[in-house]
């Protein structure tokens, strides 16, 4: 038998950009588009993390046409093709190794004269014959008519022996990190040094009762749709239990 409160409940969609929050006390408040304020007894934060880009105009031009920030998402489309990965950390090395199992050739473009990745990841990269590491290289542009066909590179930028050349590729993968979209919640929730929301162990619970974090906003490691969906399910179950414990449903 459903309670009167449950019968009265309905789903309300509110589309817009969350621009502020007040989690100091329940009911919690979230401001949409800097004007509309939503009050809620419980909140699931699933704002994700945005991939960092180099800032090239061509990145937007070729988005979905050869430019990607997720090798495991889009790598399949580059089977037996030539791709480039930008970055020098663990993520970049992981992406390069993954793509090496699909692509004909992988170029790892590294701005510095060394890799920042862990020793074991560096060793994994070097074991793949179809991965070429381009140290001291900067990607400064992309080109192609109907998609990415190549990248403009500068070797030893700013040095007397600076060299500029073009490299033919089919795909351009960015692996220079992600920025969690947690700014409007940082005043109330614990985050790590990069901004990911810290939850209690494997649960989606944050330090604020009734506020939960799910998906990439609380996951700096996996960042996959299926893991985000799983954590979203856990957050929904926790939110229901919280509301029930407060006799709100």
Feature map (PLM): residue ranges:
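Single conserved hydrophobic/aromatic residue that forms the stacking wall/gate
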Residues: 1-11
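FAD-site-proximal beta/loop scaffold in flavoenzymes
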Residues: 50, 55, 60-77, 176-222, ...
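An active-site-proximal "capping" alpha-helix that borders the catalytic cofactor pocket
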Residues: 227-243
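Glycine-rich Rossmann-fold phosphate-binding loop(s) that bind the pyrophosphate
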Residues: 87-89
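FAD-binding core/adjacent interface of flavoenzyme oxidoreductases
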Residues: 13-81, 157-162, 173, 197-201
